[in-house]
Amino acid sequence: MTKEGKLKLFSTYTIYGMTAEKFSNGRSNIEVVKVMLDSGIKIIQYREKYKSLKEKYKECLEIRKLTEDYEALLIVNDHADLCQMVGADGVHLGQEDLPADEVRKLLGDKFIIGVTTHTKDQVLKAKEDGADYVGLGPVFASFTKDNPHPPIGLEMVKWAAENSPLPFVAIGGIKEHNLKEVLASGARCICAVTEIVGADDIRKKIESLFKILKSFERS
C-alpha cells in the first residue's frame, strides 16, 4: 500500500487501535492486538510506557508481523528508532517528544508521522512541521496518562472537522455511550483505548463501535 493509501484510512469512519496493557485486565498486548485485527481494526498504535526498550522491540516485531498478515498499519508511539528497526508504518509523537520536522529528517518521507495535539495552534504547527495526521484530545476526561491534559471538548472536535489541514484521530474518554456525540461533531477516525482493551469481550465491544461508525458512514 502506498503512503497516500495508508493515510486515507485516517479520514474514514474507523477505529484507531491502541495498546494499553496496564488496562487490559491481565491480557497481553499481543493477545489484545490479535483480537483487534481479527475484528477489523486496520490501524494499531503500539504504546507501552512500562517496559524496557528491549521488551518493546520484541513485542513490536511480533505485532509488526501480525499487522502485515492482516494488511493493517503499525504506528509506534514515541520511538522513531523502534519504528525504523521493526519496519513499522509510522511513529506518533507527543508534545514533549522530538519535533516532527526533526523526526522527518531522520525517517524520510515514506514513514507516517502523527502528533498529539490539544489546541488549534498545535494542530496548525503539526502541519507546518510536516506531520501527516494529528491525535486530537482528550475529548473527554481520560485516565490512561499519568498527567492528563484537561478535556478539549466537542467544540474543538467541531473546529478540527471544519478547519484542520490534517486528518485527525479523536481520542480521550471516548466510550460506546458518547461515540455518537463525537461523530456528530465531525470526527471520523476515533480511538477508544480503555473502552476496547478493558472490555470483558473485546471482539463484541469493537463490533458495537463499528456498528455506530457504519451508521454515520451511511448517513
Swiss-Prot record:
Pfam families membership: TMP-TENI (PF02581)
- Enzyme Commission identifier(s): 2.5.1.3
Entries under InterPro entries matching the protein? Aldolase_TIM, ThiamineP_synth_sf, ThiamineP_synth_TenI, TMP_synthase
Keyword terms: Magnesium, Metal-binding, Thiamine biosynthesis, Transferase
**What does the record give as cofactor?**
Mg(2+)
| Keyword Phosphoprotein among UniProt keywords | no
Q: What is this protein called?
A: Thiamine-phosphate synthase
User: What organism is listed for this UniProt entry?
Assistant: Caldicellulosiruptor bescii (strain ATCC BAA-1888 / DSM 6725 / KCTC 15123 / Z-1320)
